[in-house]
């Protein structure tokens, strides 16, 4: 054991709680939306993609972590580590790129840079395809030999190898690629879109260019997406910051808990994403009831 056995028990209980809550609420989000035709809007396709990403994390990652925590180390070998690391990375990246698509959609709706443009089902499908391609371009390379997945922290789960410069894996180039293409760029796009959108909302409110009902509806949707983005940052920034510090300070002395805490803190989006959607979408709540 790298830590007191009680720590593994606490981790297993935490993962069980995430599974107990995360699976039903994400499955409910998918079921209710697919069951009610009026909920099958282009915007909701992207929100459904978030639910699918969360289910990948719950079924492919959380269950594995709970099982290994019961043994006190990662007992599933190289194949199990690759699968767990792949599903966790894929789910997180699908969620991030879905938020990018939502931010662009909100920017187009709010600022109307393209006159007479409507966000249609075809655009939503292209957005879904884009989020999956980008997520796979981050999650697949470690399986193909560009970097690798290894047990991290207290060895309860697997993640990207920020810790070593193992020969033959080109860890440095992949970590730089991952942080640039799959973290800094999407966050920059999100901040740009919402920064511009905030200015546009203020200008529209001052000029009263749209009806009060339309403004209220657009503000509610934008508020929901912004809260999802903030929640994503709160959960993932600590993990990204610690991972980057470890990568830049390899050889430094740090304990297993140092990486474990932000790693498992980052798993909470699987719960709060559907919660935000359910709590802030009146139409969905009415269909659910």
Swiss-Prot record:
The record, for Pfam families, names: 7tm_1 (PF00001)
The segments annotated as topological domain Extracellular are 1-7, 68-81, 145-173, 246-257
A biological-process GO annotation: visual perception
Which positions bear N6-(retinylidene)lysine? 267
Q: A GO molecular-function term, please?
A: 11-cis retinal binding
Topology versus the membrane: Multi-pass membrane protein
Q: Which GO terms describe its cellular component?
A: membrane; photoreceptor disc membrane; plasma membrane
Q: Where is this motif: 'Ionic lock' involved in activated form stabilization?
A: 105-107
Keyword tRNA processing in record: no
Topological domains annotated Cytoplasmic: 33-44, 105-123, 196-223, 280-289
The glycosylation sites are: 171
Q: Which InterPro entries match?
A: GPCR_opsins (IPR050125), GPCR_Rhodpsn (IPR000276), GPCR_Rhodpsn_7TM (IPR017452), Opsin (IPR001760), Retinal_BS (IPR027430), Rhodopsin (IPR000732)
Q: Where in the cell is it found?
A: Membrane; Cell projection, Cilium, Photoreceptor outer segment
Q: Where, by residue number, does the polypeptide cross the bilayer?
A: 8-32, 45-67, 82-104, 124-144, 174-195, 224-245, 258-279
Keywords recorded for this protein, A-Z = Cell projection, Chromophore, Disulfide bond, G-protein coupled receptor, Glycoprotein, Lipoprotein, Membrane, Palmitate, Phosphoprotein, Photoreceptor protein, Receptor, Retinal protein, Sensory transduction, Transducer, Transmembrane, Transmembrane helix, Vision
Q: Give residue numbers for the site Plays an important role in the conformation switch to the active conformation.
A: 84
Give each disulfide bond as a residue pair: 81-158
Q: How is it modified after translation?
A: Phosphorylated on some or all of the serine and threonine residues present in the C-terminal region. Contains one covalently linked retinal chromophore.
Give the function comment from the record.
Photoreceptor required for image-forming vision at low light intensity. While most salt water fish species use retinal as chromophore, most freshwater fish use 3-dehydroretinal, or a mixture of retinal and 3-dehydroretinal. Light-induced isomerization of 11-cis to all-trans retinal triggers a conformational change that activates signaling via G-proteins. Subsequent receptor phosphorylation mediates displacement of the bound G-protein alpha subunit by arrestin and terminates signaling.
Q: State the family named in the UniProt similarity comment for this chain.
A: Belongs to the G-protein coupled receptor 1 family. Opsin subfamily.
**Protein name as annotated:** Rhodopsin
Lineage, uppermost ranks: Eukaryota, Metazoa, Chordata, Craniata, Vertebrata
């Amino acid at each position: 054991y790298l830590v007191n056995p009680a720590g593994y028990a606490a981790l297993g209980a935490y993962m069980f709680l995430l599974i107990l809550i995360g699976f039903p609420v994400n499955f409910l989000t998918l079921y209710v939306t697919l069951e009610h035709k009026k909920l099958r809007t282009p915007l909701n396709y992207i929100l459904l993609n978030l639910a699918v990403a969360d289910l990948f994390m719950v079924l492919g990652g959380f269950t594995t972590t709970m099982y290994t925590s019961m043994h006190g180390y990662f007992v599933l070998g190289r194949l199990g580590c690759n699968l767990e690391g792949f599903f966790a990375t894929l789910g997180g990246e699908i969620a991030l790129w879905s938020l990018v698509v939502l931010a662009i959609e909100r920017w187009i709706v709010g600022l109307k840079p393209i006159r007479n443009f409507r966000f249609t089902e075809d655009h939503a499908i292209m957005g879904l395809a884009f989020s999956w391609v980008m997520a796979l371009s981050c999650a697949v390379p470690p399986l193909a030999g560009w970097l690798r997945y290894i047990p991290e922290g207290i060895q309860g789960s697997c993640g990207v190898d920020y810790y070593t410069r193992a020969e033959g894996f080109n860890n440095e180039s992949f970590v730089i690629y991952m942080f640039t293409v799959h973290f800094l760029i999407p966050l920059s796009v999100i901040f740009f879109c919402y920064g511009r959108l905030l200015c546009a909302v203020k200008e529209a409110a001052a000029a009263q260019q749209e009806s009060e009902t339309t403004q209220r509806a657009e503000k509610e949707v934008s508020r929901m997406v912004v809260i999802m983005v903030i929640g994503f940052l709160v959960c993932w920034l600590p993990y990204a910051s610690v991972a980057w510090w470890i990568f830049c300070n390899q050889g430094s002395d740090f304990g297993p808990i140092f990486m474990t805490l932000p790693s498992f803190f980052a798993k909470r989006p699987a719960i709060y994403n559907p919660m935000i959607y359910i709590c802030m979408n009146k139409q969905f709540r009415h269909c659910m009831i």
